[in-house]
Every structure is written in structure tokens, then in C-alpha cells.
């Protein structure tokens, strides 16, 4: 499919001037995100600028896909697209849209990465249960509507001041379907920020589905206790090595057919003889046995055996004491917004037994965005 789509027009877009920018809260290769307010009503919104690097070639197909998906998805745990606005400008051969295009969203006060970067923000077990319940509920909804998020990470999980979680940044999302022939689907595998990328994508899988998002959910769930990403690889090979060291060696015994399905499996030098250590490595942080068990089921190497969102929501973790509890009271003690973009880099190397000689890059937005390939 072409990277740009010429047939898009926005004749009924409101003028951007109805909003006043207040602060920049996000930055990446996708563009910029601003906190803003409606000049008349005072309503707070988030403005995401559509990156138009080569506007003369047409409207970016990736932005169009994001807009179409956001217009389809309406759920309490998915960010709400209010409207599309544009600035005034003169049409030229380089800018047929006469200015900039902005996506306007309901404003959320925090993202999960920003909250976890603040040592003063402390989640109780009951509050972690509520976070994961809302996250999995959002995934259940989008997967039921045949949408893959494809960029699950803590920075893309927004939380309002009232404690409502919203899955956000659908810039990499796409519709999926069951393969109609023996050749399967041919989706790009260069999706998902590296530290949250599941083993099947790292091995070159192109016919994938909802399990890729559930792997990210498992990484995020563990992060609720470790406070930083649990597998911080520098390269795809390094990421697979870290996965093997935590989840056990990738073999046909635990993942039937892996040796025949993926050409990369034979080419990569993956650790041999590694035992699965998810529970052992995390038990220093995660004291609840049900939580450990759910993380273990989310971080299963074989996507066919990985727990889905429906079964995850029915896991004993959510139905044992303490029951999930509202986040509003805890968040009410914090008066400032917390976003990854505005926070100092999070502490690193929390997980024990990480290789000591690896040179790791900070978990900055630019690092995570490096892997965004459409």
C-alpha cells in the first residue's frame, strides 16, 4: 500500500484557532502533542499534530489509518478522538492542505510511564489490579473489533485525574483478519517499541494477531512493580537474548514448530539451556502469587499458548483479595500532570541477573521511536 493517500479531504474541519496551546507534552518521529484548551468553554484537550513531511505527495496513509481506527473505537478505556482541526495557511505545491492538521483528543492528566517515573507515586496491589483490569478491558474491546494496537508500552497508557485508563497512540494500529489462504497475512513485523516487542515479531513473524499486544501487557504489568521496563535490549538480537534469559530458551519443545517456521531462528545465536525464570526473577518485586502467575501467562514464548485478554480478565488475580480499587483518591494527592516526555529518564537495571557488560541507551522517546516502522 502506498505511504500516502491522495483521496483525503477535510472540508468540514474546524479552525485550529478555537484552541489555545498550553504546553508541549509529547515529542517523537510521529510529531508533537500539546495540552490545550478550548477558548470558549475552557475544556482541556490534547492536540496531536499530523506529521506532513512530504505533503505534496498526499495525506499520509498511516495518519489516515489512525483516524479511521479512532473513529471506529468508542470505549471507556480507549482514548477519545473529538475532532480534526487545521490551521489556516496558503496552499502551495508543497502543502496542498493549506496548513497543519491536528487530531483533537480528550485530555488525560497522566501517562503510566510518567507516573512510574515518580517515586512519590505509589500503587497499592488493589490499584495495580484496577490498572491492569482497565488495560485488558481496552485490549479485549479493540481485539473484538479486529484492531491490533501494535505499540503497547507504558507511555501509551493514559490515565485521567479520575483514575480512568485509556489506551492511546494508535499510530501503528491496524485492522487484522484471519488468513484466507495458506500463505497467511503479510503484516510488517517492524512494529512495537523494541523493549515491548514479542519474540514472534523479533523472529520475523508477519502473520500475527492479538497475542502481540498481550505480550506488551505482560511487560507493562511487571513494570507496575519494577518501575522500569524489564527487558531493555539494544538490538533485536539482544532483546531475544534477554527474553530467553527470562522466559527460557526458545525451543521446539516449548514452542512447537519454531525451528521450521522462522528462518531467523537458525541464523541467530540464541541462548541454549536457559530455564524459565519469570516467577523467580520477579518475586523480589511481586509478592502476590496470583500476580506472578498472570505475568507468567502473559509472557509465554509461543503466541498460540499466550493467555488472551478474555481469560486474563477472568484470572484469579482480579477475583481475590484485595479486590481492584479506584485510582481517584491516590491520584488526587498529585496536583501536577506526569508524562514520560516531561519526566527524567526512569531508573534502569532493576531486574537482577541482567548482563552487566551491555551498553544500554536511555529509555528516551527518541530511542523508543527509532523502531517505529510502518
Curated annotation (Swiss-Prot):
Keywords: ATP-binding, Cytoplasm, DNA damage, DNA repair, Kinase, Nucleotide-binding, Nucleus, Serine/threonine-protein kinase, Transcription, Transcription regulation, Transferase. Residues 345-374 are annotated as: Disordered. Its main location: nucleus. Component of the super elongation complex (SEC). Associates with ccnt1/cyclin-T1, ccnt2/cyclin-T2 or ccnk/cyclin-K to form active P-TEFb. SUPFAM superfamilies: Protein kinase-like (PK-like). CDD domains: STKc_CDK9 (cd07865). Protein kinase involved in the regulation of transcription. Member of the cyclin-dependent kinase pair (CDK9/cyclin-T) complex, also called positive transcription elongation factor b (P-TEFb), which facilitates the transition from abortive to productive elongation by phosphorylating the CTD (C-terminal domain) of the large subunit of RNA polymerase II (RNAP II) polr2a, supt5h and rdbp. This complex is inactive when in the 7SK snRNP complex form. Regulates cytokine inducible transcription networks by facilitating promoter recognition of target transcription factors. The keyword Methyltransferase does not apply. One of its GO terms (molecular function) is protein serine kinase activity. GO terms for cellular component: cytoplasm; nucleus; PML body. It is found in: Nucleus; Cytoplasm; Nucleus, PML body. Belongs to the protein kinase superfamily. CMGC Ser/Thr protein kinase family. CDC2/CDKX subfamily. This is Cyclin-dependent kinase 9. Gene3D superfamilies: Phosphorylase Kinase, domain 1 (3.30.200.20), Transferase(Phosphotransferase) domain 1 (1.10.510.10). Disruption phenotype: Morpholino knockdown of the protein causes in larvae causes high levels of lethality. GO terms for biological process: cardiac muscle tissue regeneration; cell population proliferation; DNA repair; inflammatory response to wounding; positive regulation of protein localization to chromatin; positive regulation of transcription by RNA polymerase II; positive regulation of transcription elongation by RNA polymerase II; protein-containing complex assembly.
Amino acid at each position: 500500500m502506498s505511504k500516502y493517500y491522495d483521496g483525503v479531504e477535510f472540508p468540514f474541519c474546524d479552525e485550529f484557532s478555537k484552541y489555545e496551546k498550553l504546553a508541549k507534552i509529547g515529542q517523537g518521529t510521529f510529531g508533537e502533542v500539546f495540552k490545550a484548551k478550548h477558548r470558549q468553554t475552557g475544556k482541556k484537550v490534547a492536540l496531536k499534530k499530523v506529521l506532513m513531511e512530504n505533503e505534496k505527495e498526499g495525506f499520509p496513509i498511516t495518519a489516515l489509518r489512525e483516524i479511521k481506527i479512532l473513529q471506529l473505537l468508542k470505549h471507556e478505556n480507549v482514548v477519545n478522538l473529538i475532532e480534526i482541526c487545521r490551521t489556516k495557511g496558503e496552499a502551495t505545491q508543497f502543502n496542498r492542505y493549506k496548513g497543519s492538521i491536528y487530531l483533537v483528543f480528550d485530555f488525560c492528566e497522566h501517562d503510566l510511564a510518567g507516573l512510574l517515573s515518580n517515586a512519590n507515586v505509589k500503587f497499592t496491589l488493589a490499584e495495580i489490579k484496577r490498572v491492569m483490569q482497565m488495560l485488558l478491558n481496552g485490549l479485549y474491546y479493540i481485539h473484538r473489533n479486529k484492531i491490533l494496537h501494535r505499540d503497547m508500552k507504558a507511555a501509551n497508557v493514559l490515565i485521567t485525574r479520575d483514575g480512568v485508563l485509556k489506551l492511546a497512540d494508535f499510530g501503528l494500529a491496524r485492522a487484522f483478519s484471519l488468513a484466507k489462504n495458506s500463505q497467511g497475512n503479510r503484516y510488517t513485523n517492524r512494529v512495537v517499541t523494541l523493549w515491548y516487542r514479542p519474540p514472534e515479531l523479533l523472529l520475523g513473524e508477519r502473520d500475527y494477531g492479538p497475542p502481540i499486544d498481550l505480550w506488551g501487557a505482560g511487560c507493562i504489568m511487571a513494570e507496575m512493580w519494577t518501575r522500569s521496563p524489564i527487558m531493555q535490549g539494544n538490538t533485536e538480537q539482544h532483546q531475544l537474548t534477554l527474553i530467553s534469559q527470562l522466559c527460557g530458551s526458545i525451543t521446539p519443545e516449548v514452542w512447537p514448530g519454531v525451528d521450521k517456521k522462522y528462518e531467523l531462528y537458525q541464523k541467530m545465536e540464541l541462548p541454549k539451556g536457559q530455564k524459565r525464570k519469570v516467577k523467580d526473577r520477579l518475586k523480589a518485586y511481586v509478592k502476590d502469587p496470583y500476580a506472578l502467575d498472570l505475568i507468567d501467562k502473559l509472557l509465554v514464548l509461543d503466541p498460540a499458548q499466550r493467555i488472551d485478554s478474555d481469560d486474563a480478565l477472568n484470572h484469579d488475580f482480579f477475583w481475590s483479595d484485595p479486590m481492584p480499587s479506584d485510582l481517584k483518591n491516590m491520584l488526587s494527592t498529585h496536583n501536577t500532570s506526569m508524562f514520560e516526555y516531561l519526566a527524567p529518564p526512569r531508573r534502569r537495571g532493576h531486574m537482577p541477573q541482567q548482563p552487566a557488560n551491555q551498553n544500554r541507551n536511555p529509555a528516551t522517546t527518541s530511542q523508543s521511536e527509532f523502531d517505529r516502522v510502518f
